[in-house]
Amino acid sequence: MTKNLLEQLREMTVVVADTGDIQAIEKFTPRDATTNPSLITAAAKMPEYQEIVDQTLLQAKKDAGAGASKGQIVSLAFDRLAVSFGLKILQIIPGRVSTEVDARLSYDTEATITKARELIAQYKAAGIGPERVLIKIASTWEGIKAAEILEKEGIHCNLTLLFGLHQAIACAEAGITLISPFVGRILDWYKKETGRDSYPSAEDPGVLSVTTIYNYYKKFGYKTEVMGASFRNIGEITELAGSDLLTISPGLLGELQATIGELPRKLDPAKAATLDIDKISIDKATFDKMHAADRMAYDKLDEGIKGFTKALEELETLLAERLARLEVVASH
């Protein structure tokens, strides 16, 4: 009997759950899980996770001390909430969780390093070592340089919002653990730009982008892992079967599980090794030049950072409202 697509995918690719929803992770038993500000904000709104939110706020209030302002308490709780979700997730997966650095620090190398160290220290205080955490950082030049320093300290990074080959090469040269090239957001840009409603999966610009990056890495023997992310349909996923990892939303994991059919391997290191590819070296000037020339990558990186920033601000508002409610309850 033919297996479902998810079972077959797992035979060649590490399947990762792209969600902060703990129940969804329990259902699909992925090896790893990834979160981002939008996913944490969505999970924080779900009734079943209010207890995590409340506990985090109350602990932050206690730790911030008597004279702390509401803003200081919320800021502390906000940092801890992503780790609280991460800790819950690590109880049910065997592998690693990705926790994102504040997107507002994306163009500040020093602040990114400081924040990453703080997140790792929080995990460590809860008994989780750095080998089980990936720190997610946007693939700006400043973010990549921060990650290069963090990797040397034994803090592993997942470089996200990656849309162009120049970003991927800079990450590989910096010795980053893993990258998350986005598929669906690239497709979105091309659909809007061309006015096309759809692309066949094999011609999907996001699929082609990740395929190019994967082949480049394997051709030149880079250790940085490729984890395709941001999928719009299962066709994009099946075209990337064989990628080191793929991080997939619960909805699409369910669709893969419900689909029976053959799944051929599309990405293969042995095939990549035979390709005729030119090697490029990336310094800041080259990165800036290639980034400016790649309008899609330029637009989507900027938009992605703004989107995550908006989600962070929404989460801060949500936490402030929740804190006010908890204080009212406590005063009665």
Curated annotation (Swiss-Prot):
Biological process per Gene Ontology, one example term: carbohydrate metabolic process
Keyword Cell membrane: no
Pathway per the UniProt entry: Carbohydrate degradation; pentose phosphate pathway; D-glyceraldehyde 3-phosphate and beta-D-fructose 6-phosphate from D-ribose 5-phosphate and D-xylulose 5-phosphate (non-oxidative stage): step 2/3
Entry keyword annotation includes Mitochondrion: no
Active-site residues (renumbered): K136 (schiff-base intermediate with substrate)
Catalytic activity: D-sedoheptulose 7-phosphate + D-glyceraldehyde 3-phosphate = D-erythrose 4-phosphate + beta-D-fructose 6-phosphate
CC annotations in GO: cytoplasm
Compartment annotation: Cytoplasm
EC main group: transferase
Enzyme Commission number: 2.2.1.2
SUPFAM superfamilies according to UniProt: Aldolase (SSF51569)
Described purpose of this protein according to its UniProt entry: Transaldolase is important for the balance of metabolites in the pentose-phosphate pathway.
NCBIfam families: PRK12309.1, talAB
Family: Belongs to the transaldolase family. Type 1 subfamily.
Protein name, as recorded: Transaldolase
Gene name in the database record: tal
